[in-house]
Amino acid sequence: MAQQRRGGFKRRKKVDFIAANKIEYVDYKDTELLSRFVSERGKILPRRVPGTSAKNQRKVTTAIKRARVMALMPYVNED
């Protein structure tokens, strides 16, 4: 039989930043907002890292890709 664990810590649920701030349209020109969803190397973070919903993650990725095409955000950020 499986034993139950006692104690431990419960992981806090991540909050969707876009839904929490009631942002309906993710604008590609808002690079400050989009930089929250990009790693320091310039890669788009998977939705489990920032905790965004699937619907808002799709909005974020299309906005980031548009910003990259318009040269507002870099494709690769090398330090």
From Swiss-Prot:
Gene Ontology cellular-component terms listed: cytosolic small ribosomal subunit
Keyword Transmembrane recorded: no
GO molecular function: small ribosomal subunit rRNA binding; structural constituent of ribosome
InterPro entries: Ribosomal_bS18, Ribosomal_bS18_CS, Ribosomal_bS18_sf
Keywords: Ribonucleoprotein, Ribosomal protein, RNA-binding, rRNA-binding
One matching Pfam family: Ribosomal_S18
GO biological process, one term: translation
PROSITE patterns from the UniProt entry: RIBOSOMAL_S18
Family: Belongs to the bacterial ribosomal protein bS18 family.
Summary of subunit composition and partner proteins: Part of the 30S ribosomal subunit. Forms a tight heterodimer with protein bS6.
Cited function: Binds as a heterodimer with protein bS6 to the central domain of the 16S rRNA, where it helps stabilize the platform of the 30S subunit.
Protein's name in the database: Small ribosomal subunit protein bS18
Lineage: Bacteria, Bacillati, Bacillota, Bacilli, Lactobacillales
